[in-house]
Amino acid sequence: MLGCSNDRGEHGCPIWLGALIGLLASATACGESVFLPYAGAQYEHNSNVFALPNSAVAVLANGDPRLGDSDLKTVVGFEEDYLWDRQRLYANAEGRYFEYDHFGDLSHYEYLARVGLDWKLFSMLDGTLLGSQERVMAAFANRDTQTALAIDIDRHGIAKFNIQIAPEWRLETSVDHHNLDAPIQDFPDYGLTETIGHVAAKYLGFSNLSYGLSADYSDGRYRNAPVVGSYVQTVLDLTMTYAASGLSSFNGAVGHTQRDQGQDQGNISAITGELGYTRKFSGKTSIHIDYSRAVNSYIGAGGSELDSTVNVTLNYQPTFKTGIVLGVQEVWSAFEGQTIPGTDVIGRKDRSPGASFKLNYQALRWLLIQPYVNYQRRTSNEEFFSYSGTVIGIQVLAKKPAPPTR
């Protein structure tokens, strides 16, 4: 279940993933190993499983007026670290099974397999090699044409190479090859393939301030569906991080994004960036506020979207065993560009407020209990895409405690 599918040639294990697994295995003889198995269960109720506006639409979509359902998720997995010299090899494998009470056709399994290497050479070179593959149910809120179960296979191959040019200057580079199989109604082989390159130069000459310039270049294509095709995207940003004190910190980026998608559909030219602020009020309480504006791919219809997002997160740790996380979010989305036949995107604008609550209770060193509540609402100028829903659940996770750090 945790291996790579061999349904088709492109679903096999990538060469880089196999090589990293082999490297991880070979390191066991010469490094310090930490193996952390875990298992858990999660039961939740979702008041609007298919993210539909009302029961009348549900009848048209699947013949059933019911919107909500409960499901039980069971999970088993492990994390493993190998440390030797200045290098770190790590792996994470996880299997999950979801069983739905009413909509039995939605019951399914998922998995995650990830392996990576953080390496350092001398005092000036460092980097990362990371490979991952995940099987996951597609979110219905992001699927324009279906209420049936759809399974995505998401793969990443990431390489990072960084140089400390001088005590004050650092050059960071990375390449991410991303391959997503995302079948939708009438197009079972639909997906997205993209390669994203990143380079950033940072000045670190001040103790509490760093700044620099970053550039990203993405070359991608939507595949195996008519009308949609390739895109090219460039992002240029001025970046900054600032620690005002031991209690407050800021991070920010401002720049421009240009996305060109075939036939002048999905082209976006916009000012983009992010701004974040973190404040520790005490040893128990902190708040994080961030705003971002970014151009993203809309996999549900093969187009582009411009998203503006505000997040506010409050963390409260009253005791060693208990932590509370409160969050509110608002997302404004404008959709552009190519659309797969049967979908409706061009001119669509959404507003999506949400709120969340999670209690982390560390009952024992190896036992975590997490009740949670999430609320999500979306209003759209295309009424079919408006919905609201609440998810209430509890997760129980048993995990071998990590050994104390030396």
Name these PLM-found stretches.
Residues 30-406:
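Gram-negative and organellar
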Residues 1-13:
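N-terminal secretory signal peptides that target proteins for export/translocation
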Residues 18-19, 29-30:
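Cleavable N-terminal signal peptides
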